[in-house]
């Protein structure tokens, strides 16, 4: 395939070398004549192990060339990868100046092409950038319609400096954000030889995936550092601790807890977070990330409250009271906190939880329920249908399978607030998720 790559920094230069090595005809484009001269000499414009050999191979086979002529690069290629930098502004926002310049140049060139051209943003950009910046600029400069006259997609990269060639050849996944199916098919064809799952999503989802990956990596480093600092302060080798943590692929390094939704609770997590952060404070060990966990958790409860109270009704049915399905444990359940907030604001609340209802009559938690939360337990109703019938807003609080049917067949006139993730799709006119 004929590919033009705009921007020959770390991402663009690596892509140029790897794509040409896989048989594609690649044109590297940059405003820097120095970089272009290096590319045309088969030399690398950056320090990256193994890259220069690929660039030399590309030049020797005639599959790689460099130019400062933006227009010619577009006219002589079928697809353009935008790999320019998106540096930070002083306020932390992205500087899209390079993106905007390239989009204008590509747009003007597309205006003169009769055949379809595809534009793929590989630069890291915030969700909404392609739809709100890239597409309008190219459409305005080309006089053509995105998704119809020219293709548009995103293809976030997961390359690490110093291991970029290996990361390109053996990626964890290939993410394609497509405005139109033809663009997705084209990108899938380019990457079909790579041994990695190809994931096709909307443009906005692909944009968000890249940021989520990078922020998650930063969060992991910060978490490990704070744990290491506390561990050292109590006389423990933090490396030894984290080595064991990383051996658990069932819970610690898995998708189990990595699902957006409601706050955490129960008898362990809140208590242990408080205990560890209290000890860290006693030892004068700074722990800004760990110290923010409980505050963030409370914010999620407040978010649920705001979502529920945004509806113009006072009749609310809370489905689930324990912190998770399959238990009657109400200790530090965020749903109890949510119920208390609704009661405090005068909402007409009905609660259904079959496990808690049983415990209120028979279980070991009977005394806890009666002594600690009598104002909440008094609102428990044993009949799910009664709660549904008497409520205007139904809140799915935990993952009890009894509640699934309400998502599939929400009663007429009822509003649904999903804190669990039962909804197969995002927010609709009748149902809304806390994070979807």
UniProtKB/Swiss-Prot annotation:
It is an enzyme of class 1 (oxidoreductase). GO terms for biological process: alginic acid biosynthetic process; cellular response to cell envelope stress; response to osmotic stress; single-species biofilm formation. The active site is at residue 268. Pfam families: UDPG_MGDP_dh, UDPG_MGDP_dh_C, UDPG_MGDP_dh_N. GDP-alpha-D-mannuronate binds at residues 161, 210, 214, 217, 225, 256-257, 259, 262, 265, 324. Inhibited by GMP, ATP, GDP-D-glucose and maltose. Inhibited by GMP and deamidoNAD. GO terms for molecular function: GDP-mannose 6-dehydrogenase activity; NAD binding. This is GDP-mannose 6-dehydrogenase. It comes from Pseudomonas aeruginosa (strain ATCC 15692 / DSM 22644 / CIP 104116 / JCM 14847 / LMG 12228 / 1C / PRS 101 / PAO1).
